[in-house]
Amino acid sequence: MRKNTYAMRYVAGQPAERILPPGSFASIGQALPAGEPLSSEERIRILVWNIFKQQRAEWLSVLKNYGKDAHLVLLQEAQTTPELVQFATANYLAADQVPAFVLPQHPSGVMTLSAAHPVYCCPLREREPILRLAKSALVTVYPLPDTRLLMVVNVHAVNFSLGVDVYSKQLLPIGDQIAHHSGPVIMAGDFNAWSRPRMNALYRFAREMSLRQVRFTDDQRRRAFGRPLDFVFYRGLNVNEASVLVTRASDHNPLLVEFSPGKPEQ
């Protein structure tokens, strides 16, 4: 685990809290007392979006219109500006961000907004070998109404690297987390799978973890070299709906997926 790898937790009315990686997998489900479940409904709605460091107009209106009804919002390239922190703490019980690198004013990295407090939180970082910029990932776990624990993995994969060694290396600690979790899993984010070797490495990883890919019928996901960059993988859940929202508020389009935590597909 790298030095300087930590998560910052934002909760309404409380000072921001720094959370270090847990010492062992044994703490999954034991790190914090299980509180209210993520959803009291028979469905779990998520929004997945590389928000482009909030550099474009309309990002906040997209979050307000589509994020407020979601139980989970998985952001990549999220800068902890006052506007984003205000939205997160006003609409969610917890917001956890892993600073990948610190910009002049506000740290940027993956950020998970959740309608329940996580019972486990593990920040991860990997440095890009060419630009020396870090990319981050965040593993959080939430109680479900049926007493199962849902593991959520928010990923922003390394972009600039020769070959796929560094790309695959970033997936290894994520795989360790998933392998030690017996319940349902959602793994989503910007995987930068713009080459065939990267896509093959990602699909191989998903197979090894018994993860399925969410399919989008009108697939308007951001592409590079003809390949989609953003993905949602899952296990132990059913997919009810999946759509891509076309917007100019970022250089990526948000993914909207509704799961039901009932009996998983065979």
UniProtKB/Swiss-Prot annotation:
Grouped into one coarse class, the protein's main location is cytoplasm
Enumerate the GO terms in the molecular function aspect: catalytic activity
Read off the InterPro entries from this record.
Endo/exonu/phosph_ase_sf, Endo/exonuclease/phosphatase, UPF0294
Name the keywords, alphabetized.
Cytoplasm
List the residue ranges forming a coiled coil, or say none.
none
The highest taxon in the source lineage is Bacteria
Q: Name one GO cellular component term.
A: cytoplasm
Q: Where in the cell is it found?
A: Cytoplasm
Family, according to the entry, reads as follows: Belongs to the UPF0294 family.
Q: Which HAMAP family match?
A: UPF0294
Name listed for the protein in its UniProt record: UPF0294 protein YafD
- Which gene produces this protein? yafD
